[in-house]
Regions:
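Basic, amphipathic alpha-helical hairpins
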Residues: 10-25, 44, 48, 65-74, ...
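Short hydrophobic/aromatic patch on the recognition helix
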Residues: 40, 89-90, 94
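Residues within the alpha-helical elements of helix-turn-helix
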Residues: 32, 81-82, 97
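…primarily DNA-binding HTH/wHTH and HhH modules…
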Residues: 92-110
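Short, Lys/Arg-enriched, Trp-marked, Pro/Gly-tolerant hinge/linker segments that flank
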Residues: 1-11, 18-33, 46-54, 58
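Residues within helix-turn-helix
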Residues: 27, 38, 74-77, 87-88
C-alpha cells in the first residue's frame, strides 16, 4: 500500500472511531497523521473524489442527531460536549447539515 492510500485509510479509520464528537478541524487530522493539511486534502480528494470536510461532516451528523434525539441534554450542553465554539455556531452547523435549527429539529421529532 502506498503512502497516500495509507493516509486516506487512517483518516477514514479515525473518523470511524467517533472522534468527530469533539474534533472536526481538518488540521487536527493532518497533525495526527503527520502530514500537511494540503497533502491530506489532496490525497483524500484524489483517492475518494470527496473533500475532507464532507467526510468529517458525514461522520458528525449521526452523532449530532443522537444527542439531539436525547431530550435530557440542553442545546448548550450538546454544543459544549461536541466542542462547538459557540451556541450560535452550533445552531448554524445544524441548520446547514440538518436543514433546520437544533430546536426545530427537536420539535419535529415529537
Amino acid at each position: 500500500v502506498d503512502h497516500a492510500n495509507y493516509v486516506v485509510n487512517e483518516f477514514l479509520r479515525m473518523l470511524s472511531t467517533g472522534i468527530t464528537r469533539t474534533q472536526r478541524d481538518a488540521t487536527y487530522f493532518a497533525e495526527q497523521l503527520h502530514v500537511s493539511l494540503k497533502y491530506l486534502s489532496r490525497v483524500v480528494k484524489r483517492t475518494t473524489g470527496e473533500t475532507i470536510t464532507s467526510y468529517i461532516d458525514r461522520a458528525t451528523i449521526p452523532i449530532l442527531r443522537k444527542y439531539l434525539d436525547e431530550e435530557r441534554l440542553s442545546l448548550t450542553q450538546i454544543s459544549d460536549i461536541m466542542n462547538f465554539t459557540s451556541l450560535s455556531y452550533f445552531s448554524r452547523y445544524c441548520s446547514k447539515h440538518l436543514g433546520m435549527t437544533p430546536s426545530k429539529y427537536r420539535s419535529s421529532k415529537v
